[in-house]
C-alpha cells in the first residue's frame, strides 16, 4: 500500500501521559523527527560513556549490521490472517512450517500479533508466544513481532466472542481477510483503550525484554499519516522503552526522504519496504523488512541484490489461505477468476514443496542446497503417474490440504487438480541402529511405501485410515525409500512416520538431497 509522506510544516499534538521529554525538530529534508530527552542530554555532554540501551538513543541512532537477516513473513498456511494465527494457535503446524523455513535457509521470521486476541485471551496468547519462540529457536530462527498494522480490513464486531468463526478466504482476492490492528473503534476511542493498548505491548515485551530469540520489536507496520496512527506509534515507542528492553525497535519508514511510511521518528533504526525492483544503495544498518512481489522481483533477484548491502524479509514464506498468492490489483471489485500460475507472494506450499526450487537454491547457495535433507517429488495431473505436472523437493511428507479452491490442490499453480492426482517422493533415511522399525502411513486415500525397493505398506482403499508394518533394517546404513500417493476426492491427507530402536515415533525426514543424487 502507498501513503503520502509527512509534509514539511505538519505538526501534531503529543499524546497525554507521554513518558519521555519530547520535542519535534525539522530536518533539512522536511521530515519530522522525535528526539528524546536522553538524546538532548547526550548532545549537551551531560551523559558520559557509550549508550548501549536503545531507550537511551535518539531515533534512528541504533546501529547494527543487518546483513545476517534472510527472513520471511510467517503466517502458517492454514490461517486466513494474523488474528486467526493466534486465536487458533496450533503448535503442530507452526513447528512443521518453521522446520520447512529452516531447511530452506530462512533465519528470521516476521510475525504479526493482533490487539483483539490480547483482549480475548491474554494468558493464552502470552503462553503461545513463548511456545512459538521455543519452536523457532529450536530451528535457529530469530523472531520479530509486529504489534500494530494499518493495512487491509476492519475486524468483525464479534471477533472477541468465544465461538467466533473466521470467514473463508475469498478466491481471487489478495489478502482477503487480513485485519488492521487495532480496529477503527479502538482508534476512535483511544483514551478509553489507551491503558489496555499499553498493557498489550508491555505484557509481551516485559516477558521477553532481554530475549536473545527476538531480533527486534516492530511497533507499527506501514503506518499511515493520520494523527491517530502517529499518536499510537509514539506511545508504543515510549511504552517499549519504559520496560528497559535491550532489544531495538522499529516502525516502517523509508529509504528515501520522499518515499515511504511515517515510522522513522519512532524507530531506533530505519526499516523500509521494497516492492518495486532492486533499488537499495544504503548501508547495512537499515533493514528491508518486507519485499518480494513477482511482478517486479524474484527471490533469487532479492538475494543477489541485498547480499552485500543489508538484510531482507520476504513477504511471505507460505502460500496458503491468506491469499497473498493473488496480486494487489486482484481485489473484491476485480477478483481473479482462475488460479494464478505465478504466486504474487509466497515461497512454499502447505505440503512443504517450494513454488520454485530456484528460490531455495538462492537462499541456501548451491553447496548447501546439494546437501539439504530433501525428498525429490513428482506431481502428476492424473491418478496413474502418467501426466507429470511438476518436479520439486520437500523436507517431509506431512500434510492436510483441505478442500478449499486453490489450496485443496498440492500445487494449483502447476495445474495439479484438487481431485484425481498422484504424487511420488524418493529419498534416503538412516536407521540409527540395527533392529526392527515400524513405518506408518496416515492417509485419506491410496498409498504405497517401499523401503530398499521392497513394498512395506500398501493402502488400497479410500477413506481416512492409518496403517503400519514392521521391517528389520541394518543400522548406520542408508535405506532408500519411495512413497506413492493417489488422491481421489475429499481432503488430501498424508503423514509418513517411523519409529525404532533409539528412535521415537516421528515424521520421516531424509538424510540428503535426493533431487541431486
Question: How would you describe each model-predicted region?
Answer:
Residues 370-517:
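Acidic/polar, compositionally biased interaction segments
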Amino acid at each position: 500500500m502507498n501513503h503520502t509522506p509527512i509534509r514539511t510544516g505538519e505538526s501534531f499534538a503529543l499524546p497525554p501521559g507521554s513518558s519521555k521529554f519530547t520535542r519535534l525538530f525539522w530536518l533539512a529534508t522536511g521530515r519530522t523527527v522525535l528526539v528524546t530527552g536522553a538524546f538532548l542530554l547526550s548532545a549537551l555532554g551531560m551523559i558520559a560513556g557509550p549508550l548501549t540501551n536503545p531507550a537511551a538513543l535518539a531515533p534512528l541512532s541504533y546501529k547494527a549490521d543487518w546483513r545476517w537477516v534472510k527472513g520471511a513473513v510467517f503466517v502458517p498456511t492454514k490461517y486466513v490472517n494474523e488474528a486467526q494465527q493466534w486465536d487458533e494457535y496450533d503448535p503442530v503446524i507452526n513447528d512443521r512450517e518453521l522446520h520447512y523455513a529452516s531447511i530452506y535457509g530462512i533465519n528470521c521470521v516476521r510475525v504479526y500479533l493482533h490487539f483483539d486476541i490480547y483482549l480475548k485471551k491474554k494468558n493464552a496468547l502470552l503462553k503461545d508466544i513463548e511456545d512459538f519462540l521455543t519452536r523457532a529457536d529450536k530451528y535457529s530462527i530469530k523472531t520479530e513481532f509486529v504489534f500494530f498494522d494499518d493495512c487491509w480490513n476492519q475486524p468483525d464486531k464479534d471477533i472477541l466472542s468465544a465461538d467466533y468463526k473466521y470467514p473463508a478466504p475469498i478466491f481471487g482476492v489478495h489478502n482477503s481477510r487480513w485485519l488492521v490492528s487495532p480496529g477503527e473503534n479502538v482508534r476512535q476511542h483511544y483514551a478509553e483503550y489507551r491503558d489496555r493498548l499499553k498493557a498489550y505491548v508491555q505484557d509481551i515485551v516485559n516477558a521477553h525484554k532481554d530475549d536473545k530469540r527476538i531480533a527486534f520489536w516492530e511497533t507499527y507496520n506501514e503506518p499511515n499519516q493520520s494523527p491517530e496512527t502517529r499518536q499510537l506509534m509514539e506511545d508504543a515507542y515510549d511504552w517499549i522503552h519504559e520496560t528497559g528492553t535491550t532489544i531495538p525497535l522499529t516502525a516502517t519508514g523509508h529509504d528515501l526522504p520522499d518515499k515511504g511510511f511515517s515510522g522513522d521518528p519512532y524507530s531506533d533504526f530505519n526499516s523500509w519496504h521494497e516492492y518495486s525492483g532492486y533499488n537499495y544503495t544504503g548501508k547495512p544498518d537499515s533493514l528491508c523488512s518486507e519485499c518480494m512481489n513477482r511482478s517486479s522481483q524474484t527471490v533469487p533477484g532479492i538475494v543477489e541484490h541485498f547480499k552485500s548491502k543489508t538484510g531482507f524479509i520476504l513477504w511471505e514464506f507460505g502460500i496458503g489461505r491468506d491469499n497473498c498468492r493473488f496480486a494487489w490489483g486482484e481485489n473484491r471489485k476485480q477478483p481473479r477468476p482462475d488460479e494464478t500460475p505465478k504466486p504474487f507472494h509466497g515461497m512454499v506450499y502447505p505440503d512443504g514443496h517450494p513454488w520454485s526450487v530456484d528460490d531455495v537454491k538462492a537462499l541456501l547457495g548451491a553447496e548447501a542446497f546439494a546437501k539439504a535433507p530433501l525428498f525429490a517429488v513428482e506431481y502428476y495431473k492424473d491418478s496413474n503417474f502418467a501426466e507429470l505436472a511438476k518436479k520439486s523437493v520437500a523436507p517431509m511428507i506431512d500434510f492436510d490440504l483441505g478442500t478449499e479452491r486453490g489450496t485443496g490442490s498440492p500445487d494449483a499453480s502447476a495445474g495439479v487438480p484438487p481431485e484425481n492426482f498422484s504424487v511420488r517422493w524418493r529419498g534416503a533415511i538412516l536407521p540409527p541402529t540395527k533392529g526392527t522399525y515400524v513405518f506408518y502411513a496416515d492417509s485419506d486415500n491410496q498409498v504405497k511405501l517401499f523401503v530398499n525397493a521392497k513394498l512395506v505398506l500398501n493402502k488400497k482403499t479410500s477413506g481416512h485410515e492409518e496403517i503400519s508394518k514392521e521391517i528389520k533394517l541394518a543400522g548406520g546404513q542408508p535405506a532408500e525409500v519411495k512413497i506413492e500417493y493417489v488422491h481421489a476426492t475429499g481432503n488430501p491427507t498424508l503423514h509418513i512416520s517411523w519409529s525404532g530402536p533409539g528412535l521415537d515415533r516421528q515424521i520421516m525426514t531424509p538424510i540428503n538431497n535426493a533431487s541431486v543424487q
